[in-house]
Amino acid sequence: MAKKQNILSPIIRITFTFLVLCGLVYPLIVTGIAQAVMKDNADGSLIYNDKNEVIGSTLIGQNFTDPRYFHGRVSSIEYKAEASGSNNYAPSNPDLEKRVEKSIEEWKKQNPSVPVTEVPIDLVTNSGSGLDPDISPKAASVQVERISKLTNIPKETLDQLIKDQTEGAALGLFGETRVNVLKLNLELQKIMK
């Protein structure tokens, strides 16, 4: 019996030590560093309105259906963050073709003047998470004509707005040039007022 206690005692001490280190100390240190170095990102990159109410996050896309606004990527989960993910069909899967064709048809209804061959792929396909907040600058640009027509905002103003909201690759290396749809639409809303 004494031999069993000799074996169990270090196991219990090691388990408790790692529980405290990994479950308490490490998370507190990482949270403290994140709050000190990049507070906005650590808090979820939230965007507030004039009344200091949260209206979204730069990290999670929103579904814009009003034709006067820029639209983001297609989301099979309807931008519900708790259901992150999408049906990542293989290129050979007929369901992918059906989904893309449906997205193209919806696109054509709202943007009849833009040839289908000019529709950027990111406007008719899902991202891996289904929550992508960004589109390519080209995906924003092909929507300018529709928005200009519906809002009477000159195309040049909308083009400049896209240019101002375009972000480069992180550290010049990671990712693509992109436009955050929520931030772009908030700037558009300021012009419309």
From Swiss-Prot:
Q: Which GO terms describe its molecular function?
A: ATP binding; P-type potassium transmembrane transporter activity
Location comes to:
Cell membrane
Major localization class: membrane
The record's Gene Ontology cellular component field reads: plasma membrane
Annotated membrane topology is:
Single-pass membrane protein
Q: InterPro entries in the record, alphabetically?
A: KdpC
Q: Which Pfam families match?
A: KdpC (PF02669)
Q: Does the keyword Transmembrane apply?
A: yes
Q: Which UniProt keywords apply?
A: ATP-binding, Cell membrane, Ion transport, Membrane, Nucleotide-binding, Potassium, Potassium transport, Transmembrane, Transmembrane helix, Transport
Q: Where are the transmembrane segments?
A: 14-34
Superkingdom of the source? Bacteria
List all disulphide bridges recorded for this chain: none
Q: Does the keyword Methyltransferase apply?
A: no
Protein purpose:
Part of the high-affinity ATP-driven potassium transport (or Kdp) system, which catalyzes the hydrolysis of ATP coupled with the electrogenic transport of potassium into the cytoplasm. This subunit acts as a catalytic chaperone that increases the ATP-binding affinity of the ATP-hydrolyzing subunit KdpB by the formation of a transient KdpB/KdpC/ATP ternary complex.
Q: Which family does it belong to?
A: Belongs to the KdpC family.
The UniProt entry, under NCBIfam families, shows: kdpC, PRK00315.1, PRK13997.1
Q: Cite the record's note on assembly.
A: The system is composed of three essential subunits: KdpA, KdpB and KdpC.
* Listed name of the protein: Potassium-transporting ATPase KdpC subunit
